[in-house]
Curated annotation (Swiss-Prot):
The record marks 77 as: Transition state stabilizer. Pathway: Porphyrin-containing compound metabolism; protoporphyrin-IX biosynthesis; coproporphyrinogen-III from 5-aminolevulinate: step 4/4. The keyword Lyase applies. Keywords: Cytoplasm, Decarboxylase, Lyase, Porphyrin biosynthesis. One of its GO terms (cellular component) is cytosol. It comes from the Bacteria. Belongs to the uroporphyrinogen decarboxylase family. Pfam families: URO-D. This is Uroporphyrinogen decarboxylase. The gene is hemE. Gene3D superfamilies: 3.20.20.210. It is an enzyme of class 4 (lyase). It is found in: Cytoplasm. InterPro entries: UROD/MetE-like_sf, Uroporphyrinogen_deCO2ase_HemE, Uroporphyrinogen_deCOase.
């Protein structure tokens, strides 16, 4: 594989010295960029874009042409696994993802198998291979998956949810059915992420978007234990380099110690936690990724720089191990120039912390 020209992101995840704090943005390839909208229109619809390796690579690289980002993230969706399990995924305008065949009972869970990453999900691996080729070693490529709990919420609810009543009903009335589903999903995620690593992903991230809706006990039982299983099952070295893994639970600030104890390399933070507190709690064990509120990108350029400075100061001088990011995905109507101000501010204002 091509030599990596910028490995700042990988080094920070492994708490190795860097010249400045690396930065990337969740959903950096997306609807806030006019060029993304043009490519998506060319593809026809969202899943067609995901399934076309050349176009998926094009949208992955678009933000890198605009901003000096330190990593690229695979353009895909967390729902590729349940889609490959035959749940009939479609995207409805204004409603988000819908599954025509949701999971409603134990028999539904027993019917589904672990998808073959080089079979039903080969289009994802083709995209990874294409992106690595097109990146030409400029920056590392991040692969990703949803967490078992988060995938299960969509599969049982039949789409997005605000109250999570269907999955919580299953969790409390039929816990064994839900555990069976989560176990299959954990096995699927392990195979899926390992295939991404073999195809060229140099780091992987697990998005636990909905872990924060659980009680502390249920978080450990129904979300964290399955992410722990994934961390244990991942390829951690490839191409002569460590493959770092980041776990991110949105609204997971109360569980940082438990997340750090899984053996992951980094913990993603949302904006509801102070990064100085997070560092004091788990900074000796793991790197931290985050954690500016994505809505801050609506602010003036000066205010964005001020917020970046404040988060950098919060992480402080004590060693490396910070990957700057937003606390969740960038909003679709953020002015692209504000994202540029953010990225450049991170590089410029972080240099004194790394001397």
């Amino acid at each position: 594989m091509t030599e990596l020209k910028n490995d700042r992101y990988l080094r920070a995840l492994l708490k190795e010295p860097v010249d400045c704090t690396p930065v990337w943005m969740m959903r950096q390839a997306g609807r806030y960029l006019p060029e993304y909208k043009a490519t998506r229109a060319q593809a026809g619809d969202f899943m067609s874009l995901c399934k076309n390796a050349e176009l998926a690579s094009e949208v992955t690289l678009q933000p890198l042409r605009r901003f000096p980002l330190d990593a690229a993230i695979l353009f895909s969706d967390i729902l590729t696994i349940p889609d490959a399990m035959g749940l009939g995924l479609r995207f409805s305008t204004g409603e988000g993802p819908i599954f025509d065949n949701p999971i409603t009972c134990k028999a539904d869970v027993e019917k589904i198998g672990v998808p073959d990453p080089e079979g039903e999900l080969q289009y994802v691996m083709n995209a990874v291979r294409q992106i690595r080729k097109d990146l030409n070693g400029d920056v590392p490529l991040i692969g990703f998956s949803g967490s078992p709990w988060t995938l299960a919420t969509y599969m049982v609810e039949g789409g997005s949810s605000k109250a999570f009543t269907k999955i919580k009903k299953m969790m409390y009335a039929e816990p064994q059915t839900l555990h069976l589903l989560l176990d299959k999903l954990a096995d699927s995620v392990i195979e899926y992420l390992n295939a991404q690593i073999k195809a060229g992903a140099q780091s992987v991230m697990v998005f636990d978007t909905w872990g924060g809706v659980l009680t502390p006990r249920d978080y450990n039982l129904f979300s964290l234990q399955y992410m722990h299983k994934i961390v244990d099952g991942l390829i951690r070295e490839n191409d002569g380099r460590r493959v770092p893994v980041t776990l991110f639970t949105k609204n997971g600030g109360m569980w940082l110690e438990q997340i750090a104890a899984t053996g992951c390399d980094a913990v993603g933070l949302d904006w509801t936690i102070n990064i100085a507190d997070a560092k004091a709690r788990v900074g000796d064990k793991v790197a931290l990724q985050g954690n500016m509120d994505p809505s801050m990108l609506y602010a003036s350029h000066d205010r964005i720089r001020e917020e970046v400075a404040s988060i950098l100061e919060g992480f402080g001088h004590g060693g490396t191990g910070h990957v700057f990011n937003l606390g969740h995905g960038i909003h679709l109507d953020v002015p692209p120039e504000n994202a540029g101000v953010f990225v450049e501010a991170v590089h410029e204002l972080s240099k004194p912390y790394h001397q």
